[in-house]
């Protein structure tokens, strides 16, 4: 029994960036725990620190470089992975003392480097029990389900393909097995993520896989149909506006998956969309939105846009505002264009001055805030299902079907004590502001 008291080697871990990066962190942490390593929250307790970086925009690069610097100062032994890891020279210029650098989703390389500097412990199942669903960094009641890596698009403002490569879809049986494990472990909401969710299966020509002994096509629609059978909330993120997105709307109307679509549209001027290398048929987009809402009246639409893109005139920007007025999207994120090292858009002529970007950003947000506020006001008096995320001294806080974690609003149940985290309850909406709802259990 002497093995049981052998101290486990201790690893520190810093995870930055988007939910896709979070899933990569979960995978690495699961492998470390499975091999008997202990993951610790303090630099001075760790024998080595792994930093999983983001490199999408300049502020994210800066945050990643600062996190690496902090880990070096506080600990000294650092392995870097993630999107910024694809730019090794950029890291080495600032932090030459980093031990090893790998790009994103290089799980085996990361573990190999860990073994090199902190040898693998004697494996003992009593000290390294790992839940079947793996290590999760989200609360127990929801989880991110990553279905693919990379992207085949070449949007001029984006460098993701240069960091994460072309589309690489996971086998559908593997995705569904993971989803089943998560649900069995108590997950009530699956958030489907990737760089390009609607392209799922395109790289393998939608080949037929197998799950539960049945043939299943590798496609977003087939995946949604199968996930619906698990009896939990299924939420779609990062859905590029391909024509076949129309096919998931009936599934939402039937209650099989959540009536929620995160669909980045980026702009509404055909000229700017062409410069971005994005689909440019704005009238068709408005027609589709109208049709989707006819099929599924409860549909929540979230999108993101970029203002101040090179070449954007006041006329182009006005087209974007007109689009917002007509589309009446529920949730919207807006970014001021900023050059990302390696992005094709940096070389475009007619760069927009910073003060103009700032002014357009504020006009955009002012308009959209009024639209979002009205969309929420319209829910007053209605009954909605709410997934409880948190209990505090004032009551319970949760999310409706219209709210993704981290990025959308919340539903506050002040004074509510009869619920626990992970419960799904019916709530009558009594009050709203521009982001959140307040209500009472029915």
From Swiss-Prot:
UniProt-listed PROSITE patterns: MTTASE_N, MTTASE_RADICAL, RADICAL_SAM, TRAM
Keywords: 4Fe-4S, Cytoplasm, Iron, Iron-sulfur, Metal-binding, S-adenosyl-L-methionine, Transferase
A Gene Ontology cellular-component term: cytosol
Catalytic activity: L-aspartate(89)-[ribosomal protein uS12]-hydrogen + (sulfur carrier)-SH + AH2 + 2 S-adenosyl-L-methionine = 3-methylsulfanyl-L-aspartate(89)-[ribosomal protein uS12]-hydrogen + (sulfur carrier)-H + 5'-deoxyadenosine + L-methionine + A + S-adenosyl-L-homocysteine + 2 H(+)
Radical SAM core domain: residues covered: 137-375
Cofactor: [4Fe-4S] cluster
Top-level taxon of origin: Bacteria
Chain sites annotated for binding [4Fe-4S] cluster 1: 18, 54, 83
Cofactor note: Binds 2 [4Fe-4S] clusters. One cluster is coordinated with 3 cysteines and an exchangeable S-adenosyl-L-methionine.
Residues involved in [4Fe-4S] cluster 2 binding: 151, 155, 158
Broad EC category: transferase
InterPro entries, sorted: Elp3/MiaA/NifB-like_rSAM, Methylthiotransferase, Methylthiotransferase_CS, Methylthiotransferase_N, Methylthiotransferase_N_sf, NA-bd_OB-fold, Ribosomal_uS12_MeSTrfase_RimO, rSAM
Subcellular location: Cytoplasm
MTTase N-terminal domain sequence ranges: 9-119
Reported function: Catalyzes the methylthiolation of an aspartic acid residue of ribosomal protein uS12.
Protein name, entry field: Ribosomal protein uS12 methylthiotransferase RimO
Gene this protein is translated from: rimO
């Amino acid at each position: 029994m002497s093995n049981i008291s052998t101290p486990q080697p201790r690893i520190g871990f810093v995870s930055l960036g988007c939910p896709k990066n979070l899933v990569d962190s979960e995978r690495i942490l699961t492998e470390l725990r499975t091999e008997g390593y202990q993951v610790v929250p303090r630099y001075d307790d760790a024998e080595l620190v792994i930093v999983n970086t983001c490199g999408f925009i300049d502020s994210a690069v800066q945050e990643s470089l600062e996190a690496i610097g902090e880990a070096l100062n506080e600990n000294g032994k650092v392995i870097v992975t993630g999107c910024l890891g694809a730019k090794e020279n950029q890291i080495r210029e600032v932090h030459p003392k980093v031990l090893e650098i790998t790009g994103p989703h290089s799980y085996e390389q990361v573990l190999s480097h860990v073994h090199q500097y902190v040898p693998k412990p004697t494996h003992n199942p009593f000290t390294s029990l790992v839940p079947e669903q793996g290590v999760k960094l989200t609360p127990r009641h929801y989880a991110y389900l990553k279905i693919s890596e990379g992207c085949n698009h070449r949007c001029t403002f984006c460098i993701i393909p240069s960091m994460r490569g072309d589309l690489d879809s996971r086998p559908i049986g593997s995705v569904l097995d993971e989803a089943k494990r998560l649900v069995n472990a108590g997950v009530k909401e699956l958030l489907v993520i990737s760089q390009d969710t609607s392209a799922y299966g395109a790289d393998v020509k939608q080949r037929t896989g197998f799950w539960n002994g049945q043939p299943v096509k590798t496609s977003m629609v087939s995946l949604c149909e199968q996930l619906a059978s698990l009896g939990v909330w299924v939420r779609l993120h990062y859905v590029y506006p391909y024509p076949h997105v129309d096919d998931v709307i009936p599934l939402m109307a039937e209650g099989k998956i959540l009536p929620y679509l995160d669909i980045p549209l980026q702009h509404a001027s055909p000229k700017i969309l062409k410069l971005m290398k994005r689909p440019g048929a704005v009238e068709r987009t408005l027609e589709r939105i109208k049709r989707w809402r006819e099929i599924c009246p409860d549909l929540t639409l979230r999108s993101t846009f970029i203002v101040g893109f090179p070449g954007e005139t006041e006329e182009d920007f006005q087209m974007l505002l007109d689009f917002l007025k007509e589309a009446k999207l529920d949730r919207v994120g807006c970014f001021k264009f900023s050059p990302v090292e390696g992005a094709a858009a940096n070389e475009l002529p007619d760069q927009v001055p910073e003060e103009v970007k700032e002014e357009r950003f504020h006009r955009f947000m002012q308009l959209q805030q009024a639209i979002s506020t009205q969309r929420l006001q319209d829910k007053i008096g209605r009954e909605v299902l709410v997934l409880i995320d948190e209990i505090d001294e004032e009551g319970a806080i949760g999310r409706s079907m219209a709210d993704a974690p981290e990025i959308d609003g919340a539903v506050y149940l002040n004074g509510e004590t009869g619920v626990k985290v992970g419960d799904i309850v019916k709530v009558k909406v009594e009050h709203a502001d521009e982001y959140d709802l307040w209500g009472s259990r029915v």
